């Protein structure tokens, strides 16, 4: 028997502010399409249930078109149950919709669904039950037990916090969590593990790397496999461009260092040391690299090589600034470099990060 653990789909999220309009529109569409593909995968691969561990929607009050889409996907996948436990983003309005026999929900008390020799039990956290939910969880040890929660693992109980130490010794085989967008797992106790499936699609440069879901294979015990499933991958790389004289040379160094995939999104950080007279390279390097992939963002994080002697007789404001920084004995060499980097960019009218 197979069960899918997924979470943090964030249908209807505001991607618009992160990218140009045409890119954000395509990514918004792909977030929806990936959920549709997930349902299709489940139906075609004999999956009996999909566990949605919170934040299916990005808002407590989803747009009608987003809710209609979600329920239509479930209605069109009748062979698969969808167990939806609301998270901190969709804690109020996600359940409003049509009644579907394969759509299962949770609430402020523990609720259980049984599939063969495994039981799935979940509860939606609130300020009222955040502490008491641990003492009310009782699971038999002679069957397989999956528990669903949404929150950040923590040492103490609280709203949107999952206190792992209070779940130990509870006969949990697999703790299916939502809230953290990066896939991760760990040992809960001698019997069970906990896991975050992560989000299905990365949406910003804080969500780099593979994204997908966890496939649970259930026999006498539960085994799990992470399945990369996103339409695209968001990649962040540092590229050393020391010594380059301009943005074009930097872009050539990037092409040599990075094996671009045309379908992916990239954040390239230019690092290293370049001559003091080299201007800000990020924006121009983006233009030179625009054809390398689906979307690219380039940040110039290089240091400027400052020769103090070259500014000894410079009568400009820049010269005065450099001499003043080097004369300050209270600053370390690293502090001087950072101040000069930011100050020279500011004097040149460039963006400071």
Regions found by a protein language model. Give the residues of each.
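N-terminal active-site segment of His-dependent metallophosphoesterases
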Residues: 1-68, 141, 341-342, 349-353
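Domain-start "cap" segments at the beginnings of catalytic or binding domains
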Residues: 1-22, 211, 218-237
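Acidic/glycine-enriched edge-of-secondary-structure segments
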Residues: 21-30, 119-124, 232-248
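His/Asp/Glu-rich metal-coordinating catalytic cores
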Residues: 23, 49, 58-195, 199-204, ...
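A generic secondary-structure signal
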Residues: 37-45, 72-73, 136, 256-257
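A general structural motif
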Residues: 47, 79, 142-144, 172, ...
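Accessory, non-catalytic peripheral segments of nucleic-acid enzymes
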Residues: 220-353
């Amino acid at each position: 028997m197979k069960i899918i653990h997924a979470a943090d789909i964030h249908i209807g999220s505001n991607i618009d502010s992160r990218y140009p309009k045409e890119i954000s529109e395509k990514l918004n569409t792909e977030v929806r399409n990936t959920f549709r593909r997930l349902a299709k995968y489940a139906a075609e691969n004999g999956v009996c249930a999909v566990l949605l561990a919170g934040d299916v929607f990005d808002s407590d009050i989803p747009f009608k078109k987003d809710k209609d889409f979600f329920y239509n996907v479930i209605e069109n996948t009748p062979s698969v149950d969808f167990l939806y436990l609301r998270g901190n983003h969709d804690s109020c309005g996600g359940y409003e919709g049509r009644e579907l026999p394969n759509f299962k929900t949770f609430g402020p008390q523990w609720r259980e669904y049984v599939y063969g020799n495994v039981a799935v039990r979940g509860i939606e956290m609130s300020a009222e039950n955040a502490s008491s939910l641990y003492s009310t969880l009782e699971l038999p040890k002679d069957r397989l037990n999956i528990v669903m929660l949404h929150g950040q693992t923590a040492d103490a109980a609280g709203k949107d916090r999952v206190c792992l130490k209070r779940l130990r010794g509870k006969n949990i085989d697999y703790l299916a969590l939502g809230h953290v967008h990066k896939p991760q797992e760990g040992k809960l106790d001698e019997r069970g593990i906990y896991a975050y499936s992560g989000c299905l699609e990365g949406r910003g440069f804080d969500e780099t790397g593979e994204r997908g879901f966890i496939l649970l294979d259930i026999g006498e015990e539960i085994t799990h496999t992470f399945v990369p499933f996103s339409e695209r991958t968001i990649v962040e790389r540092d590229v050393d461009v020391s010594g380059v004289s301009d943005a074009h040379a930097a872009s050539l160094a990037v092409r040599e260092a990075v094996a671009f995939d045309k379908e992916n999104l990239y954040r390239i950080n230019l690092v290293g040391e370049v001559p003091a007279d080299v201007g800000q390279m990020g924006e121009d390097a983006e233009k030179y690299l625009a054809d390398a992939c689906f979307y690219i963002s380039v940040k110039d994080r290089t240091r400027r090589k400052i020769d103090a002697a070259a500014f000894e007789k410079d009568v400009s404001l820049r010269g005065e600034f450099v001499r003043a920084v080097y004369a300050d004995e209270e600053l370390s060499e690293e502090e001087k470099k950072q101040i000069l980097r930011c100050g020279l960019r500011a004097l040149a009218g460039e963006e400071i990060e």
